[in-house]
Amino acid sequence: MAITDGEASHPGMDRAAAGQLAERRAAETSTALSRLGAAAEIVRLRIPDTGVSRREPEVREALRELVSGFQLCLAPWDGDLHADHEAAGRAARGACAAAGTGLLSYPIWTWHWSHPGDPRVPWEAAARVPLSAEATRRKRAAIGCFASQLRPRGPQRPPVLPPEVVAHFIRDHEMLIS
């Protein structure tokens, strides 16, 4: 599920440009999923970027319907220190509890503010999941599909995700929090 389309990541965009960015992000997501080898249908909620917490009950209900009947859901960690990630994580936690579906969470921005042993991170509930060489290759190819976030937007406009940030995402393992 894509809760938002990330259309607010580029400050100063007008409504038309933000709409175009949302469609570009949706296309990038589809391409990335194919690079991963996933044939999943993407459910787009189109919640406004930066507005997930204001619509959290709606997100929780949509997720509950989606995860019902599944054994496991992966969602952003609700302690990530990014408002939309945290709201998505809380909504997933509530949806999974209501549906009887297991939940594992993944940190996204955590890598930028935490350090080993950081007491804000539940390390005791975390597991390092190694990826095969093929999975790592596919993951890197999928990340490369997000040109709207990886490329500079002009001479004075750096990418949303500079190389030092992307380095956190292209590792040969994932960390999941139970």
Go through each PLM region and give its residues.
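A conserved mid-domain beta-alpha-beta active-site/ligand-binding segment of alpha/beta enzyme cores
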Residues: 114-157
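Short, flexible loop segments at boundaries between secondary-structure elements
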Residues: 97-120
